[in-house]
């Protein structure tokens, strides 16, 4: 009869998650997990059977951590902006979990950055339509394009190549947000992709540079 494990599966997954936080998913082995638990590797294989199963459980746990961030964003006064800033916060505070979920092929979880975007898109769509008075198609395009920028900035943060503060990032997102919204409102067919691109740019170029007034 095999000895009873003194750790629950939940405790083991929590230890594995902590290993990933410090060493990345590549650093998660039976030995590093056992070291974190202060035990041998035998209880790990008794509970899970293989490290592949452990990695799947860690991915699911990482998703739950990520969900706490996005849920906090959804509670903000402007949910779609809150979600974007929480996505960036997740990248800053949990870089290895971000790397696991969004920069690594999912470990059998069917999870990816694009799937995350589509899920969030569904959640914020009603608010976008109500606040900005736009159609479902326009709301989806608005969030998708803004999310591309959010994801790019978050990836720069995780790879250690983002020189911008949260305040500067907020300014970038505001500028992109205004640009997308203005295009949706003023360029016929923008959301559907049927607008005349050349004509749109000619109209902008024809306005010439803006002259800044002296104070």
Report each predicted region and the residues it spans.
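C-terminal peripheral helix-coil segments that are non-catalytic and often amphipathic
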Residues: 126-130, 163-215
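Amphipathic alpha-helical packing segments from all-alpha helical-bundle domains
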Residues: 108-133, 140-145, 151, 155, ...
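Amphipathic alpha-helical segments that line or abut small-molecule/effector binding pockets
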Residues: 77-96, 140, 144, 174, ...
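Alpha-helical DNA-contacting segments of helix-turn-helix folds
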Residues: 20, 52-62, 101, 105, ...
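Helix-turn-helix
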Residues: 11, 15, 19-53, 57
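Helical hydrophobic small-molecule/effector-binding pocket
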Residues: 81-103, 110-117, 147-154
